[in-house]
């Protein structure tokens, strides 16, 4: 048994290593309606596919064509990466076509695209088809991504790595979009760089040549953002869209870097010299008397520092009696400190809480815009004096947000609790809150479908972090459009954690007599029975999602909420009725998919609602099967009677967070 066992272990280990490094060779994404396999459309597509590989080569690497007449016309685009060999390009395009024809999710779908790659031939290529012309248009969806199975080692300095990686991504985007040539392969860039802790990092970007330079920059930027939001921390990854693709890795690929000069790592900070300050410039030692003088001065300084420490510690000890922020000592996950702001500093920043700096009025106080001495803009929430609930909110926000850090959560910079003042200082988010856009007829027109999709996905990621990915398990309890802030790039940030509830890691549900939240967004089991779980937040998310799609407030429908109205239209087979008129020309299938997700989130039975991790998977995939929803809350007689019987005080919490 001995030598055979060793041999089997060796073979199994080798196979495991191979499987871990196997790459998926093509990225296929399909959307749109279905067509009959025996239809004229199907025949036109087959005929177009039969000549496409050779046409790409004879046209310099990029080819756009159409065949047939409406409604059976087929449009196709094909592209081979720069530096290709002709036969390699032909094989790649043919492989891409086979991927479209054989992928289960693409069978007889009208819109399809694939970025195929052949590591052996060192070539990548694109093939896309549709029943409408995409030539010259920026196409961002569907998107497909892959990531390395391996994570970056925990011992690496991720803050430094991210800074260097961001700089490399920005350089590559700029280089790819310069388009100094009129070549059909003009939007292309390959870069090789040395990082402080990695000898070689490789990055490749390319766009189809039919779009503008600005569209190319937008497409590549969306690829980079998607990678960072979904799989950051991996040792490589790829994102493919119909108009562009992006890939980076720790090893060379596609033969794209053979003639690329490596960008050196940024200079490290200069080390301090070893020469003693007690030595004179000309190398002569300071005399005995000089040493005595230095010792005396240093001793005096130490005494002053000690006295100052005692005074500061005394003040802090008094403050700690008011609020306990745990053992974090005001340090967030980036190693930056949570500041205890001096009241004078806050007064100076807000011009003594000038009414001209008022951003809004909330349930527990007023929010002001402020500017610190270093020029940083902040949002300052001054809680109402003597408010018992405000005191609870203050302690809750500080104790939770000192330990949370995520791109889709608002960042608490510090606080002040001098005398009877309770003040929270946040990062300033310039675009106010989501409700200012989605419920305003004029501003809502600025929210494109792509922007709304990104906002919805960002909110979902923030919730996933709270429920599953952070060191804590937190239920927000007051999710609504006015508690979603939008930064300068319209990225969402979940805000207002005053009513949030901290769960133990193994705790899934709790009960409370203190109902905190806003009517219309609260799950029925929480509103009626005080039952709290992650599914309570999922319900609120579903309401917001439906508001984003319809552009209407949840309470805009007399006699029934938005969820009930959407459910009735869904059962009637007319879900498009609830779609915002500003979105009527947008991808209908995607919008209806999100209506379906929203209805799943607001189902009456909390166990039937999805987790936020499932929502993220559905949002990012074109191929996953999404279950059909059941009836939402408050649509049956049982729910209606519960509404009439339920007891609720005016415990409706803050309608405005820091903005």
Curated annotation (Swiss-Prot):
Domain (Protein kinase): residue spans on this chain: 353-619
Keyword annotations from UniProtKB, A to Z: ATP-binding, Glycoprotein, Kinase, Membrane, Nucleotide-binding, Phosphoprotein, Receptor, Repeat, Serine/threonine-protein kinase, Signal, Transferase, Transmembrane, Transmembrane helix
Alphabetical list of CDD domains matching this protein: Gnk2-like, STKc_IRAK
SMART domains: S_TKc (SM00220)
Phosphothreonine: modified positions: 518
GO CC terms of this entry: membrane
Catalytic reaction equation(s): L-seryl-[protein] + ATP = O-phospho-L-seryl-[protein] + ADP + H(+); L-threonyl-[protein] + ATP = O-phospho-L-threonyl-[protein] + ADP + H(+)
Membrane topology (Extracellular): 28-289
Localization terms from the record: Membrane
Residues recorded as bearing Phosphoserine in the entry: 482
Domain Gnk2-homologous: start-end pairs: 28-134, 142-253
Enzyme Commission number(s) from the entry: 2.7.11.-
Entry-linked Pfam families: Pkinase, Stress-antifung
Glycan attachment points: 38, 64, 122, 131, 157, 170, 259, 274
Residue stretches spanning the membrane: 290-310
Broad enzyme group: transferase
Positions of the catalytic residues: 478 (proton acceptor)
Membrane-protein topology: Single-pass membrane protein
Signal peptide start-end: 1-27
Domain of life: Eukaryota
Topological region Cytoplasmic: 311-659
Predominant place of localization: membrane
Membership in a protein family: Belongs to the protein kinase superfamily. Ser/Thr protein kinase family. CRK subfamily.
Protein name: Putative cysteine-rich receptor-like protein kinase 39
Annotated gene: CRK39
């Amino acid at each position: 048994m001995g030598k055979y066992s060793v041999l089997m272990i060796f073979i199994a280990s080798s196979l495991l290593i191979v499987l871990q490094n196997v790459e998926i060779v093509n990225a296929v994404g399909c959307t749109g309606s279905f067509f009959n396999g025996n239809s004229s459309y199907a025949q036109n597509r087959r005929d177009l596919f039969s000549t496409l590989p050779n046409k790409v080569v004879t046209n310099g690497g990029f080819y756009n064509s159409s065949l047939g007449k409406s409604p059976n016309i087929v449009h196709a685009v094909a592209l081979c990466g720069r530096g290709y060999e002709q036969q390699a390009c032909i094989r790649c395009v043919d492989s891409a076509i086979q991927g479209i024809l054989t992928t289960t999710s693409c069978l007889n779908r009208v819109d399809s695209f694939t970025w195929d790659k052949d590591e052996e031939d060192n070539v990548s290529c694109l093939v896309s088809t549709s029943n409408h012309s995409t030539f010259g248009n920026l196409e961002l969806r569907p998107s497909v991504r892959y990531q390395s199975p391996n994570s970056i080692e925990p011992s690496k300095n991720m803050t430094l790595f991210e800074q260097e990686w961001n700089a490399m991504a920005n350089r590559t985007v700029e280089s790819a979009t310069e388009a100094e040539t009129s070549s059909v392969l003009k939007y292309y860039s390959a870069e090789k760089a040395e990082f402080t802790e990695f000898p070689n990092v490789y990055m490749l970007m390319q766009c189809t040549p039919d779009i503008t330079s600005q569209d190319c920059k937008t497409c590549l930027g969306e690829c980079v953002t998607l990678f960072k939001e979904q799989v950051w921390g991996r040792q490589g990854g790829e994102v493919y869209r119909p108009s562009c693709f992006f890939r980076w890795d720790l090893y060379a690929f596609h033969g794209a870097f053979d003639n690329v000069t490596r960008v050196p790592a940024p200079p490290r900070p200069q080390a301090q010299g070893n020469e003693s300050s007690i030595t004179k410039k000309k190398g002569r030692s300071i005399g005995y008397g000089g040493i005595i003088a230095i010792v005396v001065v240093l001793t005096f300084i130490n005494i002053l520092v000690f006295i100052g420490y005692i005074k500061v510690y005394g003040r802090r000890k008094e403050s700690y009696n008011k609020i306990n922020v745990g053992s974090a000592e005001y340090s967030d996950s980036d190693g930056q400190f949570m500041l205890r702001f001096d009241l004078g500093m806050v007064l100076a920043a807000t011009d003594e809480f000038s009414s001209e700096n008022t951003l809004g009025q909330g349930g527990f106080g007023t929010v002001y815009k402020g500017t610190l001495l270093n020029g940083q803009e902040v949002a300052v929430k001054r809680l109402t004096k003597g408010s018992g609930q405000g005191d609870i909110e203050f302690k809750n926000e500080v104790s939770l947000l000192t330990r949370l850090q995520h791109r889709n959560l608002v960042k608490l910079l510090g606080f002040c609790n001098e005398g009877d003042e309770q003040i929270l200082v946040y990062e300033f988010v310039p675009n106010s809150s989501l409700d200012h856009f989605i419920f305003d007829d004029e501003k809502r027109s600025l929210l494109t479908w792509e922007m709304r999709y990104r906002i919805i996905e960002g909110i979902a990621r923030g919730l996933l972090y709270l429920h599953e990915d952070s060191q804590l398990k937190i239920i927000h309890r007051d999710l609504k459009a006015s508690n979603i802030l939008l930064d300068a790039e319209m990225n969402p940030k979940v805000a207002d954690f005053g009513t949030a509830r901290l769960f133990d890691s193994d705790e899934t549900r709790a009960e409370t007599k203190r109902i905190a939240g806003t009517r219309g967004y609260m799950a029925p089991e929480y509103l009626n029975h005080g039952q709290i779980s992650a599914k309570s937040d999922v319900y609120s998310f579903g309401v917001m999602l439906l508001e984003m799609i319809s552009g209407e407030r949840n309470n805009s429908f007399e006699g029934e909420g938005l969820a009930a109205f959407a459910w009735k239209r869904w059962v009637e087979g007319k879900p498009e009725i609830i779609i915002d008129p500003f979105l009527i020309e947008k991808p209908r299938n995607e919008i209806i998919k999100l209506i379906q997700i929203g209805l799943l989130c607001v189902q009456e039975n909390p166990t039937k609602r999805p987790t936020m991790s499932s929502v993220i998977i559905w949002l990012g995939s074109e191929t996953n099967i999404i279950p059909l929803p059941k009836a939402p809350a408050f649509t049956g007689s049982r729910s209606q009677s519960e509404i009439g019987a339920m007891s609720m005080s005016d415990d409706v919490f803050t309608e405005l967070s820091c903005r």
